[in-house]
Amino acid sequence: MPPHEVWPGSIEAMYQEFMEYSYYVSKDTPTEFDQLLFLLLSEECRNLFEYKFKTPKGGHIDFPETRLDRVQKLWERVFPRNKMLRAEGRLLIQSENSEPFNPLRLSSGEKAVLYYIAGVLFAMPNAVILVEDPEFYLHHSIMKSLWDSIENLRKDCTFVYLTHDLDFAA
C-alpha cells in the first residue's frame, strides 16, 4: 500500500512527531482512535514528570488540567454510569457493576463520543472543524447536547456540520 499524505496538525502528524522522540513504546498504533488514546496518556505522563521536577521538595504547585481531565469530565457527564479510570499508566473504563476494561472494548457509539471529544481537544487553535454525519453512532437523545458541549470545549474553533438530520440542523 503506497504511503499517504499526512496533514500537518492532524492527529497522525502529532502522533508521528511524538514517536520520533519516544524510544520505549511500540511504533505501531493501528487506528486514529488508538493514536488519540496514546496522545492523551502521553500528555498526562509528560505533565506528571514536569510536575514532579518543578515541585520544590515539600512544596506544592497546582497541577495543570490536561486534555484527559477535560475528556473525562465531559465523558462522565454524557455517560454518568461510566467512569474513566487511570491505573498504572493505562486508561480504563468502568461501568456500573463491571470490572474496569480497555476503551477499545467500548461500543461503537461510546468510542465515537470519546473520539469526538478527544479529537476536538487536539485540533489546532482557531481550526475549522468539519463534522460529517454528526449523528453517526450516536443516540438521538444525546446528540445535540453532546455537540453543544464539545463546541464549548473549543470556543476558538468554528464547527461546520454536514448532516441529513433536520432536527439536528435546526
What are these regions (language model features)?
Residues G9-K111, A118-V128, N152:
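Extended helical coiled-coil dimerization/tether regions that scaffold
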Residues M1-H4:
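N-terminal low-complexity, Ser/Thr- and acidic-residue-enriched intrinsically disordered segments
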Residues E132-P134:
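Walker B catalytic acidic pair
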Residues L162:
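Conserved D-loop beta-strand region of ABC ATPase nucleotide-binding domains
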Residues S145-I150:
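Conserved hydrophobic alpha-helix in the ABC-type ATPase nucleotide-binding domain
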Residues F136-H140, K144:
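Conserved D-loop-proximal element of ABC-family nucleotide-binding domains
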Residues D165-A170:
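Conserved H-loop
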